[in-house]
């Protein structure tokens, strides 16, 4: 397991051996070039980004000891400024070591495979010679079969070539990281060059999405949000969380009309997605605020203090980013992925943690920038459903399928408007949280009727207008 430190974190440096690999996609005949790279660690220099996404259990854990009560706005502002100043001082530029003496060249095991049989054979060989842990090799082989079956079921042309190309690069990235594990700093910026991990993740998930049966709700509001971001405002998206593919799904559905949002989201990532060997390459392609989840904080008692210090640093990063303005934050106030009802098997948005939601609201209020909170719904569990139960061990089984997906947003919900008439802060917190959850749940049901109920855009309601912006 990788452990995040509260000291100055390492950063990815790139050197040597640029190798291109062409990718086919289900929606275009164009290909994307990826470079095989050699990684080496060094001290990081300060970098910036614009958009953030997080899960509430992690946010609450970070914020509980840092946020004041709503009646202590003066001390809140002081604490806020102090935290931001601390981050600025800690992240001063540090000279980095030259890479001229690094002569290590990595073998690209999978880049030249020509068939599924050859790829599986290479996985087995790597395991036999000890370069690949047996558990990872087993997971790789299983993932390949699930992915291949899902893409083949889509009926897209050149499906076998797409599968082989995407899986070859993905498995090379996995092997590369096993040889020299990448350690995520508290704030990780997506790796876009010379190897474009973001585009790799998009191209990998793209063939799993049935765009003919996928929808965006209220595309005009996404346009409105981009305008607010350009004005320096902060935006919060209170959302449900369906699968590990959520980031790619959001970006795929918005990439044509809202590339600002699609390409620059930052996600708060627990230790699961930054330590699981099969998940790390996808995480490396996203902007992440790395924290330890409350659910797994006490898995190893000896690491509790280290994890808490890492979370404190991540909170400081969040404070500084918000203070800079023009940030959009995706947060899942349920604290984790949605799960089906144990009796009916029906999926629905997980219940929101109102305290975590309120922590985020107050962070935004004290940022010194205008802030707007929107309810957002996601439906995409079919393409990569989570395990039925929350698992303690790293390395969950990943089942995949080709299916329609959806994302929808409704107009912002103002705290002061909704809480008007409430007798106290606790009642206001509950009323506001419930209003956001109800909106997410209603939008989810519209997406469900359109995608699962096969009603298409006919499932639109007066408050949720469905469209397919990529088709226009």
Curated annotation (Swiss-Prot):
PANTHER family documented for this protein: GLYCEROL-3-PHOSPHATE ACYLTRANSFERASE, CHLOROPLASTIC
Protein name (record): Glycerol-3-phosphate acyltransferase, chloroplastic
GO molecular function: glycerol-3-phosphate O-acyltransferase activity
Organism phylogeny: Eukaryota, Viridiplantae, Streptophyta, Embryophyta, Tracheophyta
Native source organism of the sequence: Spinacia oleracea
Residue span of the annotated presequence: 1-102
The keyword Lipid metabolism appears for this protein: yes
Cross-referenced Pfam families: Acyltransferase (PF01553), GPAT_N (PF14829)
Keyword line: Acyltransferase, Chloroplast, Lipid biosynthesis, Lipid metabolism, Phospholipid biosynthesis, Phospholipid metabolism, Plastid, Transferase, Transit peptide
Entry's Gene Ontology BP terms: CDP-diacylglycerol biosynthetic process; phosphatidylglycerol biosynthetic process
Main enzyme class: transferase
Major site of localization recorded for this protein: plastid
SMART domains: PlsC (SM00563)
Function: Esterifies acyl-group from acyl-ACP to the sn-1 position of glycerol-3-phosphate. The enzyme from chilling-resistant plants discriminates against non-fluid palmitic acid and selects oleic acid whereas the enzyme from sensitive plants accepts both fatty acids. This is an oleate-selective acyltransferase.
Free-text note regarding domains: The HXXXXD motif is essential for acyltransferase activity and may constitute the binding site for the phosphate moiety of the glycerol-3-phosphate.
Pathway field: Phospholipid metabolism; CDP-diacylglycerol biosynthesis; CDP-diacylglycerol from sn-glycerol 3-phosphate: step 1/3
GO cellular component term, pick one: chloroplast stroma
Subcellular compartments: Plastid, Chloroplast stroma
Family: Belongs to the GPAT/DAPAT family.
Reaction(s) the record says it catalyses: sn-glycerol 3-phosphate + an acyl-CoA = a 1-acyl-sn-glycero-3-phosphate + CoA
Motif HXXXXD motif boundaries: 241-246
């Amino acid at each position: 397991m990788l452990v995040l430190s509260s000291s100055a974190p390492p950063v990815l440096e790139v050197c040597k051996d640029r190798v291109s690999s062409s990718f086919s996609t289900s929606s275009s005949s164009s290909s994307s070039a990826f470079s095989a790279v050699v990684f080496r660690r060094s001290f990081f220099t300060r970098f910036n980004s614009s958009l953030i996404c997080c899960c509430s259990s992690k946010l609450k854990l970070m914020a509980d000891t840092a946020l004041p009560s709503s009646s202590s706005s003066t001390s809140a502002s002081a604490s806020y400024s102090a935290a931001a100043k601390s981050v600025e001082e800690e992240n001063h530029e540090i000279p980095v070591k030259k890479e001229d003496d690094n002569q290590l060249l990595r073998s690209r095991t999978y880049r030249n495979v020509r068939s599924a049989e050859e790829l599986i054979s290479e996985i087995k060989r790597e395991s036999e010679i000890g370069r690949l842990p047996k558990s990872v090799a087993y997971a790789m082989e299983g993932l390949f079969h699930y992915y291949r079956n899902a893409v083949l079921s889509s009926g897209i042309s050149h499906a076998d070539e797409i599968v082989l190309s995407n899986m070859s690069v993905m498995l090379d990235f996995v092997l590369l990281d096993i040889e020299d594990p990448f350690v995520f700093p508290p704030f990780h910026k997506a790796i876009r060059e010379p190897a474009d991990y973001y585009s790799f993740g998009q191209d990998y998930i793209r063939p799993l999405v049935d765009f003919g049966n996928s929808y965006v709700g209220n595309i005009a509001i996404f346009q409105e949000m981009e305008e607010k971001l350009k004005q320096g405002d902060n935006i919060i998206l209170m959302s449900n969380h369906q699968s590990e593919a959520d980031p790619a799904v959001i970006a795929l559905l918005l990439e044509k009309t809202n590339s600002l949002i699609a390409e620059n989201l930052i996600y708060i990532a627990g230790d699961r997605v930054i330590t699981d060997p099969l998940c790390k390459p996808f995480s490396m392609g996203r902007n992440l605020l790395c924290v330890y989840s409350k659910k797994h904080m006490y898995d190893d008692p000896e690491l509790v203090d280290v994890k808490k210090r890492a979370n404190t640093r991540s909170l400081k990063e969040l404070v500084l980013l918000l203070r800079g303005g023009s940030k959009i934050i995706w947060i899942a106030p349920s604290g984790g992925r949605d799960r089906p009802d144990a009796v009916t098997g029906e999926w629905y948005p997980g219940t929101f943690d109102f305290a975590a939601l309120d922590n985020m609201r107050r962070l935004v209020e004290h940022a010194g920038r205008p802030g707007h909170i929107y309810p957002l719904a996601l439906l995409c569990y079919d393409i990569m459903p989570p395990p039925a139960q929350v698992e303690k061990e790293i390395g969950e089984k990943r089942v995949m399928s080709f299916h329609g997906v959806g994302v929808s947003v409704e107009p912002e919900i103002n705290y002061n408007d909704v809480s008007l008439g409430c007798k106290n802060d606790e009642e206001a917190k509950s009323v506001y949280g419930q209003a956001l959850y109800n909106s997410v749940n209603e939008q989810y049901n519209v997406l469900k009727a359109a995608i699962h109920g096969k009603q298409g855009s006919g499932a639109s309601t007066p408050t949720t207008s469905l469209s397919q912006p990529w088709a226009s």
